[in-house]
Amino acid sequence: MMRDRLASLIVVKQEGGSNTSISHHQATAIKCEASLYTESSLFQEINNNSCYRQNLNAPTHQQSHTSHLQHAQQHQTHQQHPLLPPPLPTLPLIYPCRNLFPDGCDINHLACCSSSNSNSNCNSDSNSTSSSPGNSHFFANGNTCAAALTPAPPATEPRKIKPLGAGKLKVGKTDSNSDSNSNCDSRAAAAASTSATSATSATTLAATAAATAAAAEAGGAASAAAAAKISQVRLTNQATTSMLLLQPNSSFSSLSPFDNFSTQTASTTTTTSASAAGHHQHHNHLLHQQHHNQQQQQQQQQQQQQQQQQQQEHLQQQHQQQLVSPQQHLLKSETLLSHEEDQLISNLTDSSVVSHSELFSDLFFPSDSNNSLLSPTTSGYPDNPAEDLTSSIENLTKLTCLRDKRLSSIPEQQLSSEQEQQLCLLSLRSSSDPAIALHAQQQQQQQQQQQQQQQQHQQQQQHLQLQLISPIGGPLSCGSSLPSFQETYSLKYNSSSGSSPQQASSSSTAAPTPTDQVLTLKMDEDCFPPLSGGWSASPPAPSQLQQLHTLQSQAQMSHPNSSNNSSNNAGNSHNNSGGYNYHGHFNAINASANLSPSSSASSLYEYNGVSAADNFYGQQQQQQQQSYQQHNYNSHNGERYSLPTFPTISELAAATAAVEAAAAATVGGPPPVRRASLPVQRTVSPAGSTAQSPKLAKITLNQRHSHAHAHALQLNSAPNSAASSPASADLQAGRLLQAPSQLCAVCGDTAACQHYGVRTCEGCKGFFKRTVQKGSKYVCLADKNCPVDKRRRNRCQFCRFQKCLVVGMVKEVVRTDSLKGRRGRLPSKPKSPQESPPSPPISLITALVRSHVDTTPDPSCLDYSHYEEQSMSEADKVQQFYQLLTSSVDVIKQFAEKIPGYFDLLPEDQELLFQSASLELFVLRLAYRARIDDTKLIFCNGTVLHRTQCLRSFGEWLNDIMEFSRSLHNLEIDISAFACLCALTLITERHGLREPKKVEQLQMKIIGSLRDHVTYNAEAQKKQHYFSRLLGKLPELRSLSVQGLQRIFYLKLEDLVPAPALIENMFVTTLPF
């Protein structure tokens, strides 16, 4: 069962009486005590983790001799003035005290008795009903003694104890005794008026009991002050003394560092104080020598204890080195607090008469404090005692708050077993015996070393497990076949070098790493408010990682305080309900307290009630709260930093519903493929660039400084704006569309880059390059408006090349053959003149088209001179017919000579073919140029005549020609097919040919070209039986040719005009007989 300990602050105030004069006797006492502490070299210096004492052999013989002379002088002065009332102290004395009793206080501070006899004795009997030895008697020979705080009953009378509540005001009155041989028995229990449970007062610290007894039995105020090293006291007459005890009920669940320090220094303080008191009272040299020997033994024991402390500190040195950056930040805050404390101490103490009491400083402050604060000191001499008491309480309150800040970093020791609890109780009960206290401390240190060894063993095992690194850089999850959160989302982690209280608290279970790199969350672009502390050097345990990811989805984060981590907690704080809530100089731990990160190793002293008069701590706390509120921190809930908040279930549900709604709105396409949330980089196609996916965080394995910045990951639950766009619809339908800037400008195929000034595909680039380098000439067999696309770009080279020029491809950019393979350089030597290789043969259909085009009259050069002539005789009309027929046959002769392979035939066969086909070609070409809705007739020489002008000469043959023209135009024949048809009319099987095989081969070539044209031409494919219908026109031409011969024979019979030789030869050649 644990003992409750209370931090007590006793304020003793002396109220002034009627007599305000200071006698010579009083001045002598003040001088005596001042000289004692002016020359004394015994002082105490308290640092952060060790207590150093200097000159433990004091007081010296010189001090004792001086004290003896001063006592004699005081006795003589008192005999000269026997009627003077006994002096009493009037200065406000502020003595901090630790009360370790649960229900009250049983302490006598400076209980003195007053007597006019120089040989009077003052007995201070501190009795106790506890099982521990409770009686301690000290005899002091002095001139003046203050009366007890309460009237002392006779020695034979049983002592009565009046119970009072703990923490209440206890006021006693002083009494004067003029008897020179009177004995003042000062009872500590009756003076403090504690509750009935003060029977356990003997279990108090040895330093407290020794100081109380020594002060109570001191022969005079100066001797008592010398025993306890009390500051200078000013004495007045007929005054009363009051004590104010502030005792907040704060339960301590573990052994505080104060108890460790008290058990270590109890024997030293007790023996030193007792020896000093006995030496000044009896002036015995032998006792002084024994006191000196005891001090040497105590020094040896203290050195042993310091060595043990150094060993214990050496074990924790690694952990302290890892917290360098927080300690540097703590050093600045401690420097500021020390400066503020010095200012407040200067208000409480007088610079000329400031002296510290080693006894009460040891009792009140832990061994690892930096400066001696709140020592029993005497302030100045105020005019109004009430104002002085108020100001002292205010300054003491501020110093208590500051001291709590500095001492809150002291880790509380946890009682993990019943054996440790018994050991702690034993150390408390036997603190009066230095040997027992030292033995208890050694046992406690041995248990701590065993516990540290076990923890180190566990840390090594965990370190071996954490050394398994996953391929993506994160630690493998222990005991699970599935990847951990770090392995799956390692892209959201980076390293850090800061120290955090959570990691500091878990340092006992997690293995320390030498690289100070741990995985922490970091989003993209860094938008978190600055953190006051990062992660510690040790990697997080798997349980902590699970807690981390679980708590990220909560609005407020609460970190569980596990039993194995509470001992290393660097900063503990808890919520205050309102008003000041003092915890003395100890960091009280509440069972329901949560770990709260702080900006330094020591936790902040938090409270709600800040008075308007508290200009120092109130402003500081308000500034800290404002700085926390700026970064969205909650100072009372322990939330000093923020982790990225992952999307909650509601947000994920909203986002999923929005995506499903967008997919349902798209008609005619499959549902979109859901992207997996994997840490990989994806390349988005240009068409799908509008559908932005969430930006992935980048992995950075670098150390983070203490003031790290992070950003909260927020989920955009709005529906995708590109879900209803045409590009996304095409993506869902499986069609991948590309932007127009990435397509070929000529044929529409995919284009990688620009060629010759225009973005074109590789096919069009090569076609344009070959055409320019070879100087090829193409002929369009249609109307020079052929479609050029990816599928039909190879059908008409003429139109494809023209489109290349139209879109802006530059011919001058193409390298010639002489510069081929020499980019930007001219040939060093000109090549020898060589004949250029023959150009590849032009396609047959292209040659036929060219022959037709070359022998067709230009529409701009037509001859309208004979159009609609009115005055013409019939002979002129017949003569005009012969001229038109002769000129047309000459043009047809030119067309025949341009047909490829025509000159390969025998001249006889050439003449036969021409004479047989000349009249057919005349009709075919005339019918092709004629229009049904037009009355004009255009002949091969370019002459234009009206249809009525040809009736006399053509007769009924003209009507048949116009009918053939109608049927020819109904076929919608193009120029390429018409050129092939003209060639087939000439190159055909005739009677009397000498080499009909060659004529047949040439005919088959022309037919093959016509078939290819009809097959691959888009317009020709739309016509049914187009090829057979074209070939069916050849027999019709022969019939029309026969009709023409008949008309010529008729005109020859009329003999109006003689027929030309060409006509006669043609007539004779074509006759069947």
UniProtKB/Swiss-Prot annotation:
Domain of life: Eukaryota
Zinc finger (NR C4-type) stretch: 744-764, 780-804
Record-annotated NR LBD domain positions: 840-1070
GO cellular component: cytoplasm; nucleus; transcription regulator complex
Keywords linked to the UniProt accession: Developmental protein, DNA-binding, Metal-binding, Nucleus, Receptor, Transcription, Transcription regulation, Zinc, Zinc-finger
Biased segments, Low complexity type: 59-82, 175-185, 263-277, 292-326, 441-458, 495-514, 619-636
Tissue: Ubiquitously expressed in preblastoderm embryos, specifically in central nervous system and intestinal tract. Highly expressed in third instar larval imaginal disks and brain complexes, but not in ovaries.
Region Disordered, residue ranges: 55-87, 150-185, 263-326, 437-458, 492-514, 529-579, 618-640, 819-841
Bias (Basic residues) ranges: 279-291
DNA-binding region: 741-816
Gene3D superfamilies attached to this UniProt entry: Erythroid Transcription Factor GATA-1, subunit A, Retinoid X Receptor
Subunit and interaction comment: Forms a heterodimer with USP.
Name of the protein in question: Probable nuclear hormone receptor HR38
